[in-house]
Amino acid sequence: ESEADAYIESFVRSFDLRQAPLLRVRLIQTGPERHLLMYDMHHIISDGVSSNNIVQELVQLYEGQALEPLQIQYKDYAVWQQQEMQRESYQRREHFWLEHLAGELPVLNLPIAYPRPAVRSFEGAMYEFTVDANVSEQLHRIAAQTGSTLYMVLLSAYTVLLSKYSGQDDLIIGTPVAGRLLPELEPLIGMFVNTLAIRHQPKGNQTFHSYLQEARDRTLQAFEHQDYPLEELVEKLDVARDASRNPLFDTMFVLQNTESQETKLETLSFSPYVQEHSISKFDLTLSMSDEDGEIKGSFEYCTKLFGADAIERLTRDLIAILSQIGIDPDLLLGDIQVNSDERPEGFSPDSIDFVF
């Protein structure tokens, strides 16, 4: 594996945007019947769905199948996007987001271990965890009983955690959407992903059930108006730029699609190569997945801000919150307990004043 990691490290490098193609591919034999296929694409021409499409088409071609002709090309989508900006529906979406983020925008202030770099650092690591099966079952039940989704339940719990740690009751969380709103877009390779900046305002005198209803409605509205580019929103809001932070939010929440990534053919099988995680696109990103009823998660965190012990503690507190709301969703947010007495390395020594 160390040899494979060395190949990958030498393979992945910056692209010159002035020179096509923004794609490189390499196949290396690492054993008698083992190969490493590497492909590197600039994010402006691809997204996660694109990667899956490439693998699926590669499998079809390997088996001698003909690829289905595409109904449209990415350039058609780009033209449609430009035309869409002139329509009234686009103006309605713009109005929604400007209203949603009106007023003074909150800046998330989590306790950190080290001084924030003057310029954003993308050095990071990942910490993975699994939620107890009984708690997972309870969370699924809450989602079903409240007419919400597991995504909404987990996102709401995450905002409670952030509010407990930051002492803030006004938060903006980023969440990605695939952006492929038409079936014709599904098989295309290109950059369709948009990120939604969703505002959350948990209050200590609310029950989790009540807060979840608010979060559900807010999330549904955001997804209804998802087809409005984040970069356009940042420009319209005229956010004061700070080189040490993202313009609108410093944390993301993602619920991952857990389709099997291993493919087996008659004479070949392949699966993703798992490499040690060393980047963090934001201060903190919580990614969750639901695999056959079992909820798993991971924190991607900036190592210039947080120590590993701090993230382990954050994880324990998240699981504690999930356990408490799983047992009693009518618990007041202010009564939800976290392990605030523990002070591991990795957070600043200042006490954490909880808002609840």
Please annotate each region the language model reported.
Residues 47:
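A Lys-centered signature of the CheY-like receiver
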Residues 8-16, 21-30, 40-44, 56-64, ...:
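Adenylate-forming
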Residues 50:
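Receiver (REC) domain switch/active-site region of two-component response regulators
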Residues 3-7:
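Alpha-helical sensor/transducer elements of the RecA-like P-loop NTPase core
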Residues 92-97:
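Thiotemplate assembly-line natural product biosynthesis machinery
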